Structure formats: structure tokens, C-alpha cells
């Protein structure tokens, strides 16, 4: 936006300090072969409306999430190739992984109604390579599969479960007379520590960090949780497949994000978010030994999310990325600034 450039706001500072060329729509878009739209979903329609008027013939439009195409139903000019490169984590984590010479698991797709020159897949591959995604894994998906699996993952295991479980586990520890500062650190940094094992060996390696007795206990708790939460996960999946969830979310957009902002305020004022800082170091294995319930919650949530997505017809690649592989990257955001950070960047 022109006023952002004139005011030299934080986005302008970030871009210029990292050697990106900064200018307004009218100056940059008409000459671009590839235009990548990384704005929030809520802004997509107005942004795309402006872009289409300025994009040159036979250029390419890139998305990092397909909500605007699938749920809103945006129509793009036929001469424009439309692709998607969807890293399975918040944008902040994409940048951090790239800076350390790696990348994040990524889904790529081509809009079947906008690939007139049959170049979309090659462009998507090149884009994913440029952000380091090939180091972690790039899988071809579809716009529909990416959107439905993304929404399901975020509402259940990735964000919904991590948030609810953090509050639940903290309150339970306090009830059991645990030091509030220790309880807070165990949970805040426990998710990141425990889910790191998922990167290297999935649920099996995570469970193997426990003693035999603790492993059996975690398994039994996990099975109980799955029975309790299965109907809730199924309702989430049904609402996402039918479009009901997206419809309600877009209504909230029209109401100035009232529900979203109310939820953020409530979370920010919870005892967990306001808890004191624990300054002592917690050994890595202690997070596992004292986090059996957390491990059981992760196991049940991953399995339930994956199973519900597969049953709904979502391809395994998308279901896997959105139930297990993205989880450590979401946990990283909690480790930095608890739940408020996660809520802000997702």
C-alpha cells in the first residue's frame, strides 16, 4: 500500500533490510511474470481484484493457501496460470528454516481451470525449491485437498488440541499443587521438545522415549481420549467438507473478526498465559517423563485427525502433513510466546 511505503512501517523496514524491492501495485505488477499473493485470507478477494486488472497477459499468480479459490470461489482470468506452494507451517517458521539452510514440508498444486500453458507444475516446483522446501519434502496435492486438510489440522491437532491441552494440563498441575512456574515451563516448552521426536521417527519414536510402564499408560490414556473426541473431530470434518465452517468464518470477517478477537482476549487472560517464569533448566528427558498426558494427547490427536481426513477422501499426503508433520513447527510458536504467539501467526 502506498501509505505503508510513505510511513515506512515495520513491513517496509523488514522488506528493505532484506534487500527486497518495495513499490506500489501500479509500479510492480504490470511487469511481473509471477505474482505471489501472501496476504491473509480475509484480504484475498480485494487484493486479487486489484491484481487481475494489472497483471500482464499469460503471467502466473501464486497462492500459499487455497481458501480464496476453494471456499470463496474466486474466478481468475483464463490466461493467468494459478499455482499454490503451501508450506505446512506459519510464515515465520518458513523464514527461520530457510535461514538455517533447510526448509519445511510443502504441498504444491496447480488450479485445474487455470493452466492454459501447462507450465504450472514446473513453476510451483521452482518456487518450492527457492524457499528450501525440497530439503524437507515437496508433495503434489490439489487446491481442495490442501484447503480441507489445512482447516481440519488447524481446528483439531495443530492448534485446537495444543491450545486446549495447554490450558487443561496447566490447570490440572496447579490443582495437584505443582509450582506454577514449573508447570508453565513444562507445558510451554514441552510441546516443542516432545514433538521434535515426531520429526525424526513419528509417533513410534515419541513413545519410545518413555519407559515401558509409562508407554503403556500413555497408550491407554490415548485410546480413552480417542473414544471421547472422535465425535467432535468428525463434526469438525463434516463442517469443513460441507463448507459450513468456512461460511461461519467469513461471516465473522464481515463482523470485524469479533469471535476471533474475543477468543484471543480470553486466551491472553488465562492463568497459563499469565503464569510466572521458571528460570531453572528442565532436562530434555524430564519433559517426556513428566509429560505422559501430553504425549497421550498428541498421539490421539494425530491419529484421529489423520483417520478422519482419510475417511473424508483427503489424500494421504495432505492428511499426513496436516496431522503430524506440521505439529513441531506449530509447537515452536508456543515455545516462543505461549498461546498468544500461536494465535497471532496462524
From Swiss-Prot:
Residues at which NADP(+) binds: 11, 41-43, 91
The KARI C-terminal knotted domain, residue ranges: 142-286, 287-346
Binding site for Mg(2+) 1: 150, 154
Superkingdom of this protein's organism: Bacteria
Entry's cofactor comment: Binds 2 magnesium ions per subunit.
Cofactor(s) needed: Mg(2+)
Residues forming the catalytic site: 65
Domain called KARI N-terminal Rossmann: residue spans: 1-141
Record-level GO BP terms: isoleucine biosynthetic process; L-valine biosynthetic process
This protein's UniProt keywords: Amino-acid biosynthesis, Branched-chain amino acid biosynthesis, Magnesium, Metal-binding, NADP, Oxidoreductase, Repeat
First-tier enzyme category under EC: oxidoreductase
Reactions catalysed, as given in the entry: (2R)-2,3-dihydroxy-3-methylbutanoate + NADP(+) = (2S)-2-acetolactate + NADPH + H(+); (2R,3R)-2,3-dihydroxy-3-methylpentanoate + NADP(+) = (S)-2-ethyl-2-hydroxy-3-oxobutanoate + NADPH + H(+)
GO function terms (MF aspect): ketol-acid reductoisomerase activity; metal ion binding; NADP binding
E.C. numbers: 1.1.1.86
Family annotation (SUPFAM superfamilies): 6-phosphogluconate dehydrogenase C-terminal domain-like (SSF48179), NAD(P)-binding Rossmann-fold domains (SSF51735)
Residues noted as binding Mg(2+) 2 in the record, renumbered to the chain: 150, 322, 326
CC annotations in GO: cytosol
Cited Pfam families: KARI_C, KARI_N
PANTHER family named in the record: KETOL-ACID REDUCTOISOMERASE, MITOCHONDRIAL
Similarity section: Belongs to the ketol-acid reductoisomerase family.
Main function: Involved in the biosynthesis of branched-chain amino acids (BCAA). Catalyzes an alkyl-migration followed by a ketol-acid reduction of (S)-2-acetolactate (S2AL) to yield (R)-2,3-dihydroxy-isovalerate. In the isomerase reaction, S2AL is rearranged via a Mg-dependent methyl migration to produce 3-hydroxy-3-methyl-2-ketobutyrate (HMKB). In the reductase reaction, this 2-ketoacid undergoes a metal-dependent reduction by NADPH to yield (R)-2,3-dihydroxy-isovalerate.
Listed name of the protein: Ketol-acid reductoisomerase (NADP(+))
Species, as recorded: Buchnera aphidicola subsp. Uroleucon rurale
